[in-house]
């Protein structure tokens, strides 16, 4: 089998080319603007304000580098030391000294960009712990208010029923749990507050109704690959075989805000229903991809749920406030009891794809994570960037089998589920003819960009792999 090359920023007509030429300069400009706004609150701290001016100047210069398509430079020894930059970046640039912003692997350059931005803040002691993307994370979560409240109310309503079902297992109960499992998976998949129609039927009778089945069928129509059933089988088998042993589910996280909230909601469902006994969340160690989850973002989210100025749901006695407080309290209990655990690792913010989650990758924690994730019953990889790293961000034919596209992960003992709303050029595992059909459909509204249907966020995939050599 010939392994195809990766998507490049020079590939004409691709979303990667558009990202490098248009989106990245905008992202850096937004960071400059947000830094300026934050500086207004720091004027009394002269040192911090002046250091902010230095960062702002350097961000402007960096933005111009991207626009001018200058060569990507290695990190200096000082930068590596100050910001704990993994040496993998310089190793790549040593092998590819000719690359510039307009002609480089998209995956490498995008990850490199966020490392460069982080270095600028780490150099200035007053700003070393500052998350330049935090304001945007917060404002986006705040705008999800109605979805957050609705999901909290649904969870509160389901909680006693879940506990009852856990105490009285059986085939009929499993049928209901299976429906709920699919719905919580989909909420986590889409990761936004516009898809909560899934849980509008919250009673067990409604879930079993014809109307409920129709709503689910409609919601699944945009999921072009759907292996949810296989994940369900893995967890129910683990539950049957458990005999008091741990049932572990890992989440390799994507976005903070509502998506993290939805991921926590899925974890709470798994724990309350007995489909899992422990959930481990893997976060990023630096501000990354604008909205990715860092360890601090969990505490911020729980605080936001209780903050009646952030989420103005009325007096503490209102049902909305009670539901938000209940879920915040549930999360704290799960964390304090060890049922939910958060971890971070620099591997997730290197440019290395997940073919390096392997016993042979001994330099950047790939082997350590591989050994650990083998202990998990199911590893859920969230979002588009994780999908790109799973597939190597390569130019696979779109009908390529999932097991082929994820390389060593297909057989190295990690049971995985990728939940991805499609926002990049790479796409695999499609049945014959579907790519042409969707390209034609997207072309009608977006002339010349039919193949971008898989970059639009309008479709999604749920891809499972047992990790077992067949």
Swiss-Prot record:
Mn(2+) binds at residues 254-255, 292. Keywords: Hydrolase, Manganese, Metal-binding, Nickel. One of its GO terms (molecular function) is phosphatase activity. Induction: Expression is up-regulated in response to treatment with the DNA-damaging agent methyl methanesulfonate (MMS). Its EC number is 3.1.3.-. Changing residue 114 to A: Strongly reduces catalytic activity. A motif (Subfamily III RTxK motif) lies at residues 420-423. Its cofactor is Mn(2+); Ni(2+). Substrate binds at residues 23, 110, 254-255, 384-388, 423. Activity is strongly promoted by Co(2+), Ni(2+) and Mn(2+). Activity is inhibited by EDTA. InterPro entries: ARMT-1-like_metal-bd_sf, ARMT1, ARMT1-like_metal-bd. The keyword Transmembrane does not apply. It comes from the Eukaryota. GO terms for cellular component: cytoplasm; nucleus. Phosphatase activity is strongly promoted by several divalent cations but it is suggested that Mn(2+) and possibly Ni(2+) represent biologically relevant metal ion cofactors for damage-control phosphatases. Present with 6190 molecules/cell in log phase SD medium. This is Damage-control phosphatase YMR027W. It comes from Saccharomyces cerevisiae (strain ATCC 204508 / S288c).
């Amino acid at each position: 089998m010939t392994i195809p090359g990766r998507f490049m920023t020079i590939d004409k007509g691709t979303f990667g080319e558009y990202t490098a030429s248009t989106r990245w300069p905008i992202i850096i400009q937004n960071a400059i603007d947000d830094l300026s706004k934050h500086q207004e609150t720091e004027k009394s701290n002269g040192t911090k304000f002046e250091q902010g001016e230095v960062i702002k100047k350097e961000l402007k210069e960096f933005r111009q580098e991207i626009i001018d398509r200058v060569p990507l430079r290695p990190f200096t020894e000082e930068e590596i030391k100050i910001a704990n930059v993994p040496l993998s970046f310089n190793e790549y640039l040593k092998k590819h000294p000719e690359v510039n912003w307009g002609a480089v692997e998209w995956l490498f350059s995008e990850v490199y960009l966020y490392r460069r931005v982080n270095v600028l803040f780490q150099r200035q002691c007053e700003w070393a712990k500052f998350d330049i993307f935090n304001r945007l994370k917060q404002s986006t979560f705040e705008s999800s208010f109605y979805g957050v409240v609705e999901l909290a109310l649904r969870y509160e309503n389901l909680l006693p029923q879940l506990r009852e079902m856990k105490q009285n297992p059986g085939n009929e109960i499993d049928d209901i749990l299976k429906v709920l499992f699919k719905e919580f998976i989909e909420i986590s998949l889409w990761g936004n507050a516009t898809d909560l129609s899934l849980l509008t039927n919250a009673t067990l009778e409604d879930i079993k109704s014809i109307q409920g089945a129709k709503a689910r069928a409609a919601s699944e129509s945009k999921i072009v690959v759907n292996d949810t059933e296989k994940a369900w089988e893995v967890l129910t088998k683990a539950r049957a075989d458990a005999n008091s042993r741990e049932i572990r589910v890992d989440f390799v996280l994507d976005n903070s805000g509502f998506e993290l909230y939805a991921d926590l909601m899925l974890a709470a469902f798994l724990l309350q229903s007995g489909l899992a006994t422990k959930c481990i969340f893997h976060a990023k160690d630096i501000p990354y991809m604008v909205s990715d989850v860092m360890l601090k973002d969990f505490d911020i989210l729980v605080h936001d749920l209780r903050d009646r100025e952030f989420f103005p749901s009325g007096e503490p006695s209102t049902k909305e406030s009670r539901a938000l407080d209940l879920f915040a309290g549930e999360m704290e209990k799960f964390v304090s009891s060890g049922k939910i655990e958060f971890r971070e690792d620099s591997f997730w913010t290197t440019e290395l794809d997940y073919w390096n989650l392997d016993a042979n990758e001994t330099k950047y924690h790939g082997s350590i994570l591989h050994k650990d994730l083998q202990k998990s019953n199911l590893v859920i990889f969230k979002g588009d960037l994780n999908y790109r790293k799973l597939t190597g961000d390569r130019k696979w034919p779109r009908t390529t089998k999932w097991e082929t596209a994820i390389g060593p992960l297909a057989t190295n003992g990690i049971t995985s589920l990728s939940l991805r709303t499609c926002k990049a050029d790479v796409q695999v595992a499609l049945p014959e003819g579907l790519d042409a059909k969707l390209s034609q459909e997207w072309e009608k509204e977006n002339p010349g960009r039919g193949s971008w249907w898989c970059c639009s966020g309008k479709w999604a995939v749920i891809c499972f792999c047992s990790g077992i050599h067949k």
